[in-house]
Amino acid sequence: MAAESLPFAFETVSSWELEAWYEDLQEVLSSDEIGGTYISSPGNEEEESKTFTTLDPASLAWLTEEPGPAEVTSTSQSPRSPDSSQSSMAQEEEEEDQGRTRKRKQSGQCAARAGKQRMKEKEQENERKVAQLAEENERLKLEIERLTREVETTRRALIDRMVSLHQA
């Protein structure tokens, strides 16, 4: 399984959010190991329905478009009776939630792309700075060598002059 970058700048997320996301990820991964389906004992259809209707799809918004638990929430509901207006309302709410989740996924992916772009730009800027500093360092080394030679030449000239004044 390949790691993906986060859809946001790392410093904008609080530790409690990261912890909650980590717990959600653990739940998703454990359900993936089981096969991505929810297995219930016979006669628990009502409890199963509660489980999947209370699952918050927004917590899974950062997942990729790959099939997984987000699809399970939409397909694993108990059968509806045709005269039940509550179940149709619940279905509409769930569809709205899934629509919001898709929008969040898309905006999260856009944010991830923007974050990656900023990281690339920052990396390129840092590389330019390193190159500039290396050039500046080399220039300063050459300047130090030149000044060292000049000081040595001046020192010799001064010593020669003092010796010639002493002899005269």
UniProtKB/Swiss-Prot annotation:
Subunit relationships: Heterodimer. Interacts with TCF7L2/TCF4, EP300/P300, HDAC1, HDAC5 and HDAC6. Interacts with TRIB3 which blocks its association with EP300/P300. Interacts with FOXO3, CEBPB and ATF4.
Region (Interaction with TRIB3): 10-18
Residue span, bZIP domain: 98-161
Bias kind Low complexity: ranges: 73-88
Chain intervals for the UniProt region annotation (Disordered): 34-130
Role description: Multifunctional transcription factor in ER stress response. Plays an essential role in the response to a wide variety of cell stresses and induces cell cycle arrest and apoptosis in response to ER stress. Plays a dual role both as an inhibitor of CCAAT/enhancer-binding protein (C/EBP) function and as an activator of other genes. Acts as a dominant-negative regulator of C/EBP-induced transcription: dimerizes with members of the C/EBP family, impairs their association with C/EBP binding sites in the promoter regions, and inhibits the expression of C/EBP regulated genes.
Lineage: Eukaryota, Metazoa, Chordata, Craniata, Vertebrata
Leucine-zipper, as annotated region: 133-147
Sequence ranges of Basic and acidic residues compositional bias: 118-130
Key words of the record: Activator, Apoptosis, Cell cycle, Cytoplasm, DNA-binding, Growth arrest, Nucleus, Phosphoprotein, Repressor, Stress response, Transcription, Transcription regulation, Ubl conjugation, Unfolded protein response, Wnt signaling pathway
Family: Belongs to the bZIP family.
PTMs per UniProt: Ubiquitinated, leading to its degradation by the proteasome.
InterPro entries according to UniProt: bZIP, bZIP_sf, DNA_damage_induc_transcript_3
A biological process term (GO) from this entry: regulation of DNA-templated transcription
Modified residues (Phosphoserine): S14, S15, S30, S31, S78, S81
SMART domains in alphabetical order: BRLZ
Region (N-terminal): 10-26
Entry annotated with the keyword Transmembrane: no
Record GO terms (molecular function): cAMP response element binding protein binding; DNA binding; DNA-binding transcription activator activity, RNA polymerase II-specific; DNA-binding transcription factor activity; identical protein binding; leucine zipper domain binding; protein heterodimerization activity; protein homodimerization activity
Any single GO CC term annotated in Swiss-Prot or TrEMBL for this entry: protein-DNA complex
Span list, region Basic motif: 100-129
Superkingdom, natural source: Eukaryota
Record's protein name: DNA damage-inducible transcript 3 protein
Location of this chain's protein in the cell: Cytoplasm; Nucleus
Domain notes: The N-terminal region is necessary for its proteasomal degradation, transcriptional activity and interaction with EP300/P300.
Main location: cytoplasm
